[in-house]
């Protein structure tokens, strides 16, 4: 069975594993998922990620991050642009997540960027997800 929205599946698996206090999550690999994982690592929401060869294709393994008393670093994730309703934003109208405390992941012509990076570069694009 084909998957309609692999990005939503990726974000849902991260959220569920984080809620259940898992140490890592294994997911099917794709370039866009690896780019999202790189942004989450750079912003401090996950500890690390790596790819491994599986029997069929590759596997993306995401190591989740928790605080000293097991508080979650990933409080929430929301998919914004979906296959049935695409959401785009101009560089002058980029969303702020929780007043700047969270991150919006934007797919631009220069690759995946956070809302702050896209504003600095003056590019807009498709708003993929909010992370806080």
From Swiss-Prot:
GO terms for molecular function: rRNA binding; structural constituent of ribosome. Coiled coil: none annotated. It comes from the Bacteria. Keywords: Ribonucleoprotein, Ribosomal protein, RNA-binding, rRNA-binding. Disulfide bonds: none annotated. SUPFAM superfamilies: Ribosomal protein S8 (SSF56047). One of its GO terms (cellular component) is ribosome. InterPro entries: Ribosomal_uS8, Ribosomal_uS8_CS, Ribosomal_uS8_sf. One of its GO terms (biological process) is translation. One of the primary rRNA binding proteins, it binds directly to 16S rRNA central domain where it helps coordinate assembly of the platform of the 30S subunit. Part of the 30S ribosomal subunit. Contacts proteins S5 and S12. Belongs to the universal ribosomal protein uS8 family. NCBIfam families: PRK00136.1. This is Small ribosomal subunit protein uS8. It comes from Rhodococcus opacus (strain B4).
């Amino acid at each position: 069975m084909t998957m309609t929205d692999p990005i939503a599946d990726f974000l849902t698996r991260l959220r569920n594993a984080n809620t259940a206090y898992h140490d890592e999550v294994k997911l099917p690999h794709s370039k866009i998922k690896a780019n999202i994982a790189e942004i989450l690592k750079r912003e401090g929401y996950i500890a690390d990620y790596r790819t491994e060869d599986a029997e069929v294709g590759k596997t993306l393994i995401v190591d989740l991050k928790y605080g000293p008393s097991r508080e979650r670093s990933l409080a929430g994730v929301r998919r914004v642009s979906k296959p049935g309703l695409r959401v785009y934003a101009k560089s002058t109208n980029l969303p702020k997540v929780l007043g700047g405390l969270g991150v919006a992941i934007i797919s631009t012509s220069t690759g995946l960027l956070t809302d702050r990076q896209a504003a600095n570069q003056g590019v807009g694009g498709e708003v993929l997800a909010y992370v806080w």
